[in-house]
């Protein structure tokens, strides 16, 4: 929810550097890649590379050029450490030790676990909350949107390409917009359905324009950063305002307050930017791991709130 906004901010900052970082600007790195490609990525040498490349690597889209970049990255890192220098970044990222076809193993596994937690909580929600609850379909839709975002986050951390990067960004933006929509339905829509319909159309238009501009015109990291910070702030303020207004009347909304505050606090982990521990675990992966129980708590809030609304609507029906 709110934490995705912080994640997008930091992803945008990293991506803005992706066109050139200290490591990939080094002549030794560039010369190494060029020489590796000349020796291994054409003619008979390329056929030899393909014949010895594991099938899972080729299926994941790892090419000879990618392998050259990976090997030369570690050559450059070794030289830096030999000379007593700090570990450099390459294309806006720290060097990670690849495991099988996973480019960033810890972040990929953590993203998968976030998705798994969301799936488990979705199944629990559908088991314990009747479909007649006023928020049922909106909450289920939010869960599927979240699952889709975590799927693409897992794919992106498994294999960083232009496509997977864009899908990770776009799906994360969709989650934040859907969280705003979820808040609108809960705070306004149950009494004023027409307002929600108009607001839903507005959000869909915003998402369409946003994705179209970044896909068809140019991927502007600066614009993407500003847009996602703006919608993230709207999301945080709206949820917090509603929770604080209703916390005495509805004790279960305290779970939502904890979720929003925790996600904001945990996002500070991303500011602790450091080279990966054991070349696997960086601040971003730690942040992903730490959000797993937070998502469970948010779905628990949605379950409690949906059951409360169901009881309220049933009581009102009896009175009528």
From Swiss-Prot:
Membrane topology: Multi-pass membrane protein
Location within or outside the cell: Golgi apparatus membrane
The keyword 4Fe-4S is annotated on this UniProt entry: no
First-level EC class: hydrolase
Gene Ontology biological process terms, A to Z: GPI anchor biosynthetic process; GPI anchor metabolic process
Function: Involved in the fatty acid remodeling steps of GPI-anchor maturation where the unsaturated acyl chain at sn-2 of inositol phosphate is replaced by a saturated stearoyl chain. May catalyze the first step of the fatty acid remodeling, by removing the unsaturated acyl chain at sn-2 of inositol phosphate, generating a lyso-GPI intermediate. The fatty acid remodeling steps is critical for the integration of GPI-APs into lipid rafts.
Additional notes on this entry: When transfected in S.cerevisiae, it can complement the absence of yeast of PER1 protein, suggesting a conserved role in lipid remodeling steps of GPI-anchor maturation.
Protein name: GPI-specific phospholipase A2-like PGAP3
């Amino acid at each position: 929810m709110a934490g995705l906004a912080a994640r997008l901010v930091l992803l945008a900052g990293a991506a803005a550097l992706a066109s050139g970082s200290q490591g990939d600007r080094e002549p030794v790195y560039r010369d190494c890649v060029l020489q590796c490609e000349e020796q291994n990525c054409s003619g008979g040498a390329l056929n030899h590379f393909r014949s010895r490349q594991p099938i899972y690597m080729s299926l994941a889209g790892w090419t000879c050029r990618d392998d050259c970049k990976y090997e030369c990255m570690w050559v450059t890192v070794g030289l830096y450490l030999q000379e007593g220098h700090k570990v450099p970044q390459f294309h806006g990222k720290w060097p990670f030790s690849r495991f099988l076809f996973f480019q960033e193993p810890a972040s990929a596994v953590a993203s998968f676990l976030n998705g798994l937690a969301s799936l488990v909580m979705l199944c629990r929600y559908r088991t314990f909350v009747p479909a007649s609850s006023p928020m049922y379909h909106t909450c289920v839709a939010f869960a599927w949107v979240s699952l889709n975002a975590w799927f693409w986050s897992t794919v992106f951390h498994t294999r960083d390409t232009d496509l997977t990067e864009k899908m990770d960004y776009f799906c994360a933006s969709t989650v934040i917009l859907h969280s705003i929509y979820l808040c609108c339905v809960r705070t306004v829509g149950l009494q004023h359905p027409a307002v929600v319909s108009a607001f839903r159309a507005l959000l869909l238009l915003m998402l369409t324009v946003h994705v179209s501009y970044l896909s068809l015109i140019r991927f502007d990291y600066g614009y993407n950063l500003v847009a996602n910070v703006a919608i993230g702030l709207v999301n945080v303020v709206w949820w917090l305002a509603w929770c604080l207004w209703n916390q005495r009347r509805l004790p279960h909304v305290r779970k939502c307050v904890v979720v929003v505050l925790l996600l904001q606090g945990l996002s500070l982990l991303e500011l602790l930017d450091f080279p990966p521990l054991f070349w696997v675990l960086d601040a971003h992966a730690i942040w992903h791991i730490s959000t797993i129980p937070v998502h469970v708590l948010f779905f628990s809030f949605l379950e409690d709130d949906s059951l409360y609304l169901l009881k309220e609507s049933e009581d009102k029906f009896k009175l009528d």
